Every structure is written in structure tokens, then in C-alpha cells.
């Protein structure tokens, strides 16, 4: 945690992946995306120097408000050394995550496993999981981290836990409290399993076609 004192009040700001929840990170991403230069603006003939500076200043102001909870009228009075620390914190957050090869995680006293074995059994439940893997990969490509808690609630299970799509909301809500190191590990796991999931979908599709043709 980054510990800073502003106007005699101490603030603890998450600056490591294992310290921030999915919800917190999604909030940061939304602000950062809001002030990105669009492709159309990038390729325009206009000089964007001044505009870039204005957008960056607005972005950092909104990020400071989000990270500290300080009102917009008070944020302008934050000492520059504290602002520099917060900006450094943001820069660290958007650096690339280095995976450790995790295939399970502990959360609120329970152990959940990534879907490692679905290729071995070949059940319809495994087919559902393979579809979720493919769907998750598309979400990640589009930066939709906000969707991942629900998808992880479906795919990441305790030993002998069954997939129950009708009662997944409570688990998904709980998983919004997962920290980003776990979510990143899951995303890297997905990238490795995408090809396998496509093969499973293809296999089940071929089986269905054979059934129809018989």
C-alpha cells in the first residue's frame, strides 16, 4: 500500500496487484479509457499537443479523486510530492503483470481451482465450460474485466462443486472482491486454454452433426 498524508489525514492507496480488487481496477480503467486519444483524433491534421496535456490533467485529477475519495474542490490543494507519488502509483498499476503459473487460489477461506480437467471427462458440463473459456478470452481482448467475476464464478470451482448457472449470482458478487493478481493469473490461464476449448467445441459440434445424420 502507498501511505500518504493529505491535510493531516492518512490515505492507504493500493499500488500492487494483490492489494486491489477487480471493482477497484475496473474503476481505474474506466477513467483512463475516458481520456484516451481516439484513433480519429490521432490521425487528424490538428496539433493535439495542447489537447493531450488537457486530457492528461483531467485524467489525473479524476484518478486522484477516485483513489483518495477527496472532493474535486479539495484535490487541487494536494501537495505536488503526494501527487507525484499517486501518479507513480498509477504508472505501476498499468505495467504488465508477470504471471506465476497459478492454477488455483484461496479466497475467504475456500480453495478454488481453475478448470484444468474439463478435457478429460467430455461431459455436457465440460462443454459449457469450454464455451465460457472462449467467451472469457473475447472479454479480455476487449478489456472487459468487469465481466470476469461472473465468468470465474462459473469456471473456478472447489473440489466436487457442480456448475449451477441458475444460482451463480451470489458467487459472482462475492468474486468481485477478488484481487487483480488472481484475475491476471486466470487471464493468462485462459490464453493457454483457448485452443483446447475451441477443439472441445469442435468435437461436440461434430458429435451433434453425426447424431443428426444417423
Residue spans of the language-model regions?
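Charged interaction scaffolds used for protein-protein
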Residues: 1-214
Amino acid at each position: 500500500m502507498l501511505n500518504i498524508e493529505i491535510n493531516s489525514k492518512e490515505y492507504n492507496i493500493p499500488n500492487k496487484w494483490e492489494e486491489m480488487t477487480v471493482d477497484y481496477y475496473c474503476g481505474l480503467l474506466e477513467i483512463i479509457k475516458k481520456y484516451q486519444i481516439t484513433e480519429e483524433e490521432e490521425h487528424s491534421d490538428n496539433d493535439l499537443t495542447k489537447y493531450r496535456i488537457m486530457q492528461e490533467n483531467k485524467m489525473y485529477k479524476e484518478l486522484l479523486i477516485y483513489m483518495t475519495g477527496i472532493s474535486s474542490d479539495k484535490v487541487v490543494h494536494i501537495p505536488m510530492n503526494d501527487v507525484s507519488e499517486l501518479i507513480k502509483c498509477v504508472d505501476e498499476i498499468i505495467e504488465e503483470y508477470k504471471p506465476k503459473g497459478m492454477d488455483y487460489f484461496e479466497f475467504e477461506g475456500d480453495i478454488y481451482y481453475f478448470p484444468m480437467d474439463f478435457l478429460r471427462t467430455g461431459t455436457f458440463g465440460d462443454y459449457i465450460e469450454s464455451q465460457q473459456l472462449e467467451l472469457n478470452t473475447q472479454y479480455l481482448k476487449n478489456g472487459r474485466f468487469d465481466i470476469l467475476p461472473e465468468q470465474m464464478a462459473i469456471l473456478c470451482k472447489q473440489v466436487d462443486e457442480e456448475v449451477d448457472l441458475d444460482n451463480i449470482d451470489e458467487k459472482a458478487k462475492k468474486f468481485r472482491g477478488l484481487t487483480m493478481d488472481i484475475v491476471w493469473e486466470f487471464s493468462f490461464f485462459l490464453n493457454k486454454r483457448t485452443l483446447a476449448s475451441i477443439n472441445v467445441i469442435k468435437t461436440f459440434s461434430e458429435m451433434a452433426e453425426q447424431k443428426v445424420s444417423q
